[in-house]
Amino acid sequence: MITSLKFNNCFAFNNTIEMSLKADMRTKKFTSNVTNISDNLNILKSTAIYGPNNTGKTTLINCIKAIKGTLLNKEIHLDSNIFTGSDICEEAISFIYDNKEYSYEYKFDDKKMMYIYEKMCEIVKDQYNNEKEKLIFLKDTIDEKYECPQDEELAKVLNIASNNNILIYTVQIEKFPILEKIKTILTGIANNIEIVDMNKIPNSKTIQMLKNKDDETKKVVEFIKNADLYLEDYMYIEDLNVEIDGKVVDEKILKNQNFMDQIKIVSVYKGQAVPSIIFDSLGTRKFAALASYVIEAIEQGKTLVIDELDSSLHFKITRAIISMFNNEINKKAQLIATLHDISLLDCKRMFRKEQIWFTDKDENGTDLYSLKEFSYAENGVRDTSNIQEKYIKGEFGAIPEPDLISTLLEVDNEEI
C-alpha cells in the first residue's frame, strides 16, 4: 500500500506536490475505510481526487506511472515543467512492504536522461512515536555523497555506478545481498500498482480471466452481473463461429487475435447470447473491462490507480466500486481515483475527510490539498457537513467558472 507521494517539477507540477494516504489517528469515523498496519500506522483504503479540467489530476496519475516504470526498468515518459527553467524532475513514494514502511526518491535530469540522486530509507518510530528515517542507501551525485550503512563495499561503488538508470539496474546485485533485497522491495511495490485510464481501458485482462475459467473468473462474472446491467451472463466462447455474409470465416484469415477475442466476448440477455462489442453500451463495456482490475486488486491486495473512474458509469455503480474498497472485508487493497461526479463527495456515508483531495491552479501553478485542511473552527466544515453543497459554492476552491455564454453573445454582436 502507498502511504505518501511527493512530486516536484514534473509535467504540470511546477512546485512541490504532496499527498498523504495515512489516516488521521484522531478520527474514529469509518474505521472500515482504513487498514491497520500497526498500533500507530493506519492507511487509507481509498482516495478520491476532484478538480477542474487541466489542473493536475491526470498529471498525478502520470507521475505514479513514471515511478512504476522507473522501478520496473520500463521506458518512461517524465518531463520537467516548461516554466521553471529546471530540467530536474523529483519523485518520491513511501509505501508498506512486508508490514514495514519504506521511502524511495530520485531526481531525474530529463535533458541529460540521467538519475542524479537516489535515496531509500526504512521509516521507523522512536520511543516517543516520532517518525525517523533509517538510511538504506544514498547515491547523491549533486553533493557527492554516497552511503550504504549496511554494506560498506556497496557504498564504495556507488560513486562509479552509471547514472543512466537507477541503482538496482546498474550494479550486479549478485555481488551485494543488500542490493538484491532492495530490488525485491522496490519491484515488489511497483508490481503491486495497477494504473487504468477509463477513457482507453483495455479489456484484455477481463478476457484473460474469462479464458482461465477459475475462481477469479466466477468472481468477475458475478461482479458484472451484480451491477444490475440487465445481464444474465457474461462469457468468452472459444469455439464461437464468426460469420460474414452468412459464411463462417476461418480465424486464420482474420489473423488479428485481439479482434477475435473481442468478437468472442458475449453477453446474455433473456437467454440469448449476443456479441458484447455490438450490443452492449460503452458504459457496460467499460465496466466489464474494469471488473478484472477491481477483483484482482481486492483478491491480491493491490493498489489500483484509476483516472476518470466515473467515466460512462452510473454514479451508483461508481459508489459501489468505491465501497468494495471501503469495507472490513478488504484488508490491503487500495484505490486512488480521479473523479468529477460530485454526488460522491459524501462524508456522511462514504468518505473520511482525509480521503478527499482537490487539485486547483492559479497564476502561481498547481496545488493539491485535502478536505482535512478545512476545519470547523476556521471553515465551518464538519464530517457531517453537506460537502457537495459547499463544493458547488466554491468554498473549497478547485471548481471551474466557465463563461461559455459570452461566446454566443460575441457571435451575436458580430452578426449585428
Segments (PLM) and residue ranges:
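Pre-Walker A-like glycine/lysine-rich segment at the N-terminus of P-loop NTPase domains
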Residues: M1-A66
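C-terminal lobe/lid and adjacent interdomain/linker elements of RecA-like ASCE P-loop ATPase modules
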Residues: M1-T3, A320-I416
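Short beta-strand segments that buttress and anchor functional surface loops
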Residues: F7, E91-Y97, S267
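Extended helical coiled-coil dimerization/tether regions that scaffold
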Residues: N8, K200-F279, F396, P400-E401, ...
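Phosphate-binding glycine-rich loops of NTP-binding sites
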Residues: L41-N81, F287-A288, Y293, M324
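Conserved ABC ATPase signature
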Residues: S46-Y50, D250-I295, T303, L309-L313
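Electropositive, glycine-dotted interaction segments
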Residues: K107-V242
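Short alpha-helix of the ABC ATPase nucleotide-binding domain corresponding to the H-loop/switch region
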Residues: H314-R319
